[in-house]
């Protein structure tokens, strides 16, 4: 310790005592050491304590594997370089603050994943993901967002990085409600949802959950992003399929106030609107598989 010294003590029992100056230096040194330990141990842990779950395990490997599988199944996408796709995906969030992600960060990935979906073949959905995906598994020429390359890559995954490092954060990621909305996952889905809606043309279908209190929720991705990015010069009609929760529910949910709100929004954008009750979703899927079945002529 610089400028600190030991002082002899007079008396019958000689010993070594620290001078007041030395004691002060020692105390300051101990405090500095404690502070260093706190900064090294506590601060990194504090940075990781977001409210949401951490990045999905084996995230890089999962994205790459999904890309390879998708491009093998879809011949029109075989030109895609999956390593470049992963590099662009990673570049959108690595080393960036996980609450300060922008749509621009994802633009390189968007360009690599550009994909043309035929007119009349887009199916949007809100709060009824499983049935929408069951439908497109049967009706193979219809596409939800998750049936496109970019949607397929990220479906059900979580990811974020650590600010100013090249690390992926596997401990926790921001929750869009509790922490911030400009997080890597939320911004990704907002970006791809907007592009998906902008590309839609002719008749666009949307599947809505009739068992929810708000059948159309203007705060959902469909209500806040996709509805407002349908292009009137390309889209003729938005047709809503309202899925009923049980056979005993015979109400006309197309008259629900939230559906009327949706109709008003769409009409003001110079797009036609139609609505259909799907009273029996199980029968609905059966009739998609076998449209010639005589029972499919009745209302489902």
From Swiss-Prot:
GO terms for cellular component: basolateral plasma membrane; cell surface; extracellular exosome; membrane; nuclear membrane; plasma membrane. Expressed at high levels in pancreas, liver, kidney, brain, testis, ovary, placenta, malignant lymphoma and neuroblastoma. It catalyses: 2'-phospho-cyclic ADP-ribose + nicotinate = nicotinate-adenine dinucleotide phosphate; NAD(+) = cyclic ADP-beta-D-ribose + nicotinamide + H(+); NAD(+) + H2O = ADP-D-ribose + nicotinamide + H(+); cyclic ADP-beta-D-ribose + H2O = ADP-D-ribose. One of its GO terms (biological process) is response to interleukin-1. Its EC number is 3.2.2.-, 3.2.2.6, 2.4.99.20. Changing residue 173 to A: Loss of cADPR hydrolase and ADP-ribosyl cyclase activity. Optimum pH for NAADP(+) production is 5.0 from either substrate, activity is much higher at pH 5.0 than 7.4. It comes from the Eukaryota. One of its GO terms (molecular function) is transferase activity. The keyword Transmembrane applies. It is a single-pass type II membrane protein. The active site is at residues 119, 201. It holds the Pfam family Rib_hydrolayse. Disulfide bonds join 67-82, 99-180, 160-173, 254-275, 287-296. The chain crosses the membrane at residues 22-42. ATP inhibits the cADPR hydrolyzing activity. Keywords: Diabetes mellitus, Disulfide bond, Glycoprotein, Hydrolase, Membrane, NAD, NADP, Receptor, Signal-anchor, Transferase, Transmembrane, Transmembrane helix. Glycans are attached at residues 100, 164, 209, 219. Residues 1-21 are cytoplasmic. Synthesizes cyclic ADP-ribose (cADPR), a second messenger for glucose-induced insulin secretion. Synthesizes the Ca(2+) mobilizer nicotinate-adenine dinucleotide phosphate, NAADP(+), from 2'-phospho-cADPR and nicotinic acid, as well as from NADP(+) and nicotinic acid. At both pH 5.0 and pH 7.4 preferentially transforms 2'-phospho-cADPR into NAADP(+), while preferentially cleaving NADP(+) to cADPR and ADPRP rather than into NADDP(+). Has cADPR hydrolase activity. Belongs to the ADP-ribosyl cyclase family. Homodimer. This is ADP-ribosyl cyclase/cyclic ADP-ribose hydrolase 1. It comes from Homo sapiens (Human). The lineage of its organism: Eukaryota, Metazoa, Chordata, Craniata, Vertebrata. The gene is CD38.
């Amino acid at each position: 310790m610089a400028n600190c010294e030991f002082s002899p003590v007079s008396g019958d029992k000689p010993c070594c005592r620290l001078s007041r100056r030395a004691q002060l230096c020692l105390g300051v040194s101990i405090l500095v050491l404690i502070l260093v330990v706190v900064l090294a141990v506590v601060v990194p842990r504090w940075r990781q304590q977001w409210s949401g779950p951490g990045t999905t395990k084996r995230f890089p490997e999962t994205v790459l594997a999904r890309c390879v599988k998708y491009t093998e199944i879809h011949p029109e996408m075989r030109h895609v370089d999956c390593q470049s796709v992963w590099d662009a995906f990673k570049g959108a969030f690595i080393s960036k603050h996980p609450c300060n992600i922008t749509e621009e960060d994802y633009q390189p990935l968007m360009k690599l994943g550009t994909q043309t979906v035929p007119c009349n073949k887009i199916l949007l959905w809100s709060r009824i993901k499983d049935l929408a995906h069951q439908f497109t598994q049967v009706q193979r020429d219809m596409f939800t967002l998750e049936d496109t390359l970019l949607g397929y890559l990220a479906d059900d995954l979580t990811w974020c990085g650590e600010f100013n490092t090249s690390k992926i954060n596997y401990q926790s990621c921001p929750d869009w409600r509790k922490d911030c909305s400009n997080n890597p996952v939320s911004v990704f889905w907002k970006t791809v949802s907007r592009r998906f809606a902008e590309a839609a043309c002719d008749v666009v279908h949307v599947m809505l959950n009739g068992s929810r209190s708000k059948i159309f929720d203007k705060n959902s991705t469909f209500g806040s992003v996709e509805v407002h990015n349908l292009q009137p010069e390309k889209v003729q009609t938005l047709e809503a399929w309202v899925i009923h929760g049980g056979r005993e529910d015979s109400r006309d949910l197309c008259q629900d106030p939230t559906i009327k709100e949706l109709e008003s929004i769409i009409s003001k954008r110079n797009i036609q609107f139609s609505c259909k009750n799907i009273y029996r979703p199980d029968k609905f899927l059966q009739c998609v598989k076998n449209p010639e079945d005589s029972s499919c002529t009745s209302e489902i």
